[in-house]
Amino acid sequence: MTPSTIQIIAAALFFIAIAHTFATRFFERLAHKNPRHAGIWHLLGEVEIVFGFWAMVLVLLMFAIQGSEEATKYIDTRNFTEPLFVFTVMVMSGTRPILQTATALVAATAKLLHLPGSSGSYLAVLILAPLLGSFITEPAAMTLAAMLLGQQFLSREVSEKFKYATLGVLFVNVSIGGTLTNFAAPPVLMVATPWQWDMGFMLTHFGWKAALAVCVNAIGVTVLFRKELVNLPPAPASSSKPVPAPLIAANILLLAGVVVFAHHPAIFLGMFLLFLGLSSAYIRHSDRLILREALLVAFFLAGLVVLGGLQQWWLQPVLLQMNSNQVFFGATILTAFTDNAALTYLGSLVSGLSDEFKYALVAGAVTGGGLTVIANAPNPAGMAILRPHFKYGAVKPLGLLMAALPATIVAGLAFLLL
């Protein structure tokens, strides 16, 4: 396949955007050195801005080279349902009624575990939230887990190593934890219909292996940082008044409705507007809605949709050159530099793939979903919520990569050997 000029430009901008994600701290330093233009440098230093910014550059170049008709046609044919859904579910999952319910569930589980200090709560969050993602979707699970981990652990006196290890395990566990069903994990969703993978297939081929890996990863990081967790007393109870049960039920029903109609933006956005009205009517039972963070994440994902739509010309041949044994490792590595749903989507376009190839492609894609912020669609949501708790308000990409590597290896072994 001979690439067009725009495809070559899009590939170049895509790799520039990837490099930009590794250089956000450079822009933060520029903001301190050059206060006159600190605003623009701070903007470019936001990880969530990166892909949206370079997608805008691509669209401007498309207007200049191809004309307005072709440029607008390309944008109109992109599917922005996922960014809209992630925005909606982030805001709705981060509310006081939902968080109080999740906190109560974690506290009840921690009591059953009988572990010292904060170990029980920590272990419960890293196991329950990712597995719950198979039913409430991964973005909702990521938002809940990140909010709980931020409030109860990362905002307190803990080491940077602990913070990176927590983020790495969270990203990997959420990526693999959504594979118990065929609708919650974006890379699975892309292939479930064309490959006829139902919930029974997912549970028997992926789900139990993923659940085992999630538990091993969570237990491993808990044991590794047991001294910090044992010395960390349980987080103090929230000073907020308990939310009335009818309001909790209304919030849960609206969130469930959004999840059920996740592929119908006209419906779930209508539910979101109703949720905003409800939050405004009962503002005394609401905390600040995370609208800014959710909008940044949606901008990031929308940019990924625009840039990613022109990468098929080089990505698909790379995948098809591999056999079923090689594609697992290839998909795991490629996922770190692309979106894992994009990888599996490209695989779904190819006919005649063996069952072994299909399994290896999806298993590799979800295994590598925690290595970088762009590897899995929910990762930017977790990053936006937890990043302020890290030193200088920034997460080092290499630090995240190294922190996620052990959990990634555990997940890979589970999918390959079990």
Residue ranges and their predicted role:
Residues 90-96, 116-117, 128-140, 172-181, ...:
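Helix-loop-helix module between adjacent transmembrane segments
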Residues 59-75, 89-108, 131-143, 309-317:
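Transmembrane alpha-helix boundary signature
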Residues 2, 6-31, 164, 168, ...:
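Juxtamembrane and boundary regions of transmembrane helices in multi-pass small-molecule transporters
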Residues 1-8, 40-48, 69-83, 199-209, ...:
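Interfacial loop-to-helix junctions that mark the boundaries of transmembrane helices
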Residues 114, 120-176, 190, 345-363, ...:
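Hydrophobic transmembrane alpha-helices that form the pore/transport pathway of multi-pass ion
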Residues 8-26, 46-64, 79-92, 144, ...:
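Hydrophobic mid-bilayer segments of alpha-helices in multi-pass membrane transport proteins
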Residues 65-68, 72-73, 99, 250-355:
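Transmembrane helical segments that form the transport core of multi-pass membrane transport proteins
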Residues 38, 224-248, 283-292:
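Flexible interhelical linker loops that connect adjacent transmembrane helices
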